[in-house]
Amino acid sequence: FSPAYTDYEIDEIAQCSSHLVFNSLSQFNRFHLQSKQANSNISIGLRVNPEYSEVETLLYNPCAAGTRFGVPADKLPQQLPADIEGFHIHCHCENDSDVFERTLQHIEDKFSPWFKQIKWINFGGGHLMTRKGYDIKRLVSILQKFKTKYPHLKVILEPGSAFAWQTGSLVSQVVDIVEDKGISTAILNVSFTCH
């Protein structure tokens, strides 16, 4: 997934991918045929926005007002374009399964009318499954109930930071220091927000 693709990279990305998710209908319309020509086996999806997230830090909340991430339900056509095979929803950040359960209700409320038209659903990352105290049994139960309701949908969960959680140190380098109005800021060669 990327919020936007460009002409000079889409062929290479499609050739290296089994799935390709577009962030908007305009990106889908611009690149889906080119992606299919580059890789006839690629499965194309669309990032959708359930307009609900319990992420408290606005910087990390992809459902905050004015977001650039995903298509809300009221912007989707009743009949999806034939090449859209899946939905991608990413609206968690270090959350537990209780948050996923509440979020899933919003996802179903908004997007279940299209579930018959797709083959897979990617619930994104941000599920901190490896954190001590994470309720794995609850997550499994939630996913089993969902699969019972929608047996044709392949469910995808991204590992995200959960698999690197507390596994080592982040090593970076100060590459510059900028000053503005008496505030000095170190510019590092790593990103605080990788998404």
Question: Which residues does each predicted region cover?
Answer:
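C-terminal active-site-proximal or functional interface alpha/beta core segments in diverse enzymes
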Residues: 91-195
